[in-house]
Amino acid sequence: MMGKTLIINMNDVHIEGDILDLSGENTGVIYNMSKEVEEEVAIDYVSEESKYELKERKYDACTFFFNLNNIWGGRRKESIIREVSSYLKEEGSIYIWDVNKERGKIIDNKVKVLLPNEKVKEVEFKNYNPLITCTFEEVKKILEKYYKIEETKVWEDIFFIKGVRI
């Protein structure tokens, strides 16, 4: 059973430089948004195989797009965020869009992403595990250990956090 359709307006989001996109199966949103900003964009998608190559590079920005809610436990989330921080340049930025998911809740939603040039990308996201949580407060608290929080937004069931590496 499909839940709500949520809307994210990304017309005013500008991510510049080399981007490390950790969006997993939601790939394409960050790429489509970024290629409107710059002619040539280097976006790397992380998989287990590419982790070793990452250690050789430093990125200007890192993005998570609705994938932290699939990670079990706060310590695991923190470990991933800490690792990603090591791939960012000094003062690199992290951008996180995710769903506010309390314990016991399941998610089956569609997200319409409004991109530059009036493009629209639809993404479905599901999380049927009632034990996993992913809340704005939980993620913000982890980020504050490694980043200066520059911007936050919470609307409907979604949150956005932008931080700059400290």
Model region roles, listed by residue range:
Residues 2-5, 41-53:
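A short, well-structured beta->alpha microelement
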Residues 99-146:
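C-terminal alpha-helical "lid/dimerization" subdomain adjacent to the S-adenosyl-L-methionine
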Residues 70-90, 98:
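A short, conserved alpha-helix within the catalytic core of class I
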Residues 14-28:
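Conserved class I S-adenosyl-L-methionine
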Residues 140-166:
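Core SAM-dependent methyltransferase catalytic element
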Residues 1-17:
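Conserved alpha-helix/loop element of class I SAM-dependent methyltransferases that forms part
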Residues 51-64:
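A short acidic, Gly/Pro-enriched loop at the edge of an enzyme's catalytic core
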